[in-house]
Amino acid sequence: MNQRRVAITGLGPISALGVGMEPTWAAMLKGRCALSAIEAFDASGFDCWIGGEVRDFKANKVVPKSYRKAVKVMARDIELAVGAADAAARDAGLITKGIAEDGAEPTYPPHRMGAHIGAPLISADIDELTVAMVDSLPDDGAFDYKKFGAEGITKVTPLWLLKYLPNMLACHVTIIHDTQGPSNTITCNEASSGLSIGESLRVIQRGQADLCFCGGAESKINPLSWLRNLLTGRINTQDNDRPHQAVRPFDQSADGTITGEGGGIVILEALETLQQRGGKAYAQLLGFGASQSVNRAAHNLKPEPDGRGIASAIRAALREAQLEPGDIDMIVPFGLAHRDYDRAEAAAFQAVFGERLRDIPLVAPKAMAGSCGAGAGGLDICIAAKAIAEQTIPARINCDNPIEGLRAATAPAQAAELRHVLTCSTSLGGQNAAIVLGKMDR
């Protein structure tokens, strides 16, 4: 039996660059960095106080009126996923329960729509726990679990946990759009979005659904998340006074990343059903690969220096796409702007592409939007798909002295023949995902 072909038909990026593809693409073409001083909370006491905030976004503006009460039990991460899913569905020209007007019939039967969404460890709002924590402290000031269980927990709203379960991103998206097909949540840090997109690809290929919402979202603009990321040693704490130059992927002077919030949800559809409804697509999803890196010397807190695991995922994606390394025309890399990660990723690219690597442009969105964690791969694939559709390489910034052998130097946007584009991501835990997209006329 021939395997079903799958296309990307809707793009829903959400980040400091904007909400939806239009502002995001405009920023990518201009090379506009959106990093700035944090406003969501007072970050002045931290070693880093700049980030990539999503501004001018309110979840209740995209949630159906009948469902708006649920917004009060949505953490910021959930709100971002809901906003991205709404943008993606509208971009694909879909009618779903969440965006139907006048009782219009949905484009697809609910049982033929699925959702696989990458999610993070969601950080709680400090204000929601402060009173409970204070009531759990005895006279000596040491936290008392028994006191918390007897007194402190009574100060926590009964619905508190529903805001912070990672699967709630997918839950709210599926409820709003009434997707009753296969649904899953992937929580593998920065690899979550890529792995979720791969899961949706497999579900559609197997015929278990005709359409899937997939990708991911995360907000790292939270005091607890902020502290946790600083403790990993991956954050740039030296460039608070120049946020637009702080994230320098693949530059010899890279000094760490800057966190942000957002991600991207995309709509995948079986090509046959897409053609039946007369829809349009940005690109085909030709291949997917996943792997696990193991750096035993560093207990996985640092990447494998040789990038072996990343290379394995890329090769798997190329095999499924039935392509050779020389067929790739652009790469949207992980591009964390941390020297260990950048060099490991560069080693992986060198192992796969050899001398051809010098001719393949690398476009790293984190230089402009910061690291969106579990949502990063979703934002990356939105940019990759749009680049193929527009046959345009977005601008590259903050790389004046690139790692030897990489075409990552600062450059303006330019027209180019893009037949195939690779996206790849890795994570603090060593999970890797690689996706190959192809031009629609292939």
Model region roles, listed by residue range:
Residues 22-26, 124-142, 204-206, 226-239, ...:
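A glycine- and small-aliphatic-rich helix-loop capping segment at beta-alpha/alpha-beta transitions
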Residues 8, 29-177, 181-184, 217-226, ...:
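Conserved beta-ketoacyl condensing-enzyme motif
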Residues 81-94, 166-170, 174-177, 183-218, ...:
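Active-site-proximal alpha-helical scaffold in enzymes
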Residues 5-9, 33-37, 242-323, 329-330, ...:
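Condensing-enzyme catalytic core mediating Claisen C-C bond formation in acyl metabolism
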Residues 42, 73-79, 108-110, 160-166, ...:
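Active-site nucleophile and cofactor-binding loops and adjacent substrate-binding regions
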Residues 137-156, 198, 202, 218-275, ...:
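Glycine-/small-residue-rich "gating" segment that lines the acyl/pantetheine channel
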Residues 39, 210-255, 288-305, 333-343, ...:
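Acyl-CoA/ACP chain-elongation machinery
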Residues 1-70, 92, 272-284, 382-397, ...:
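ACP-dependent fatty acid/polyketide chain-elongation machinery
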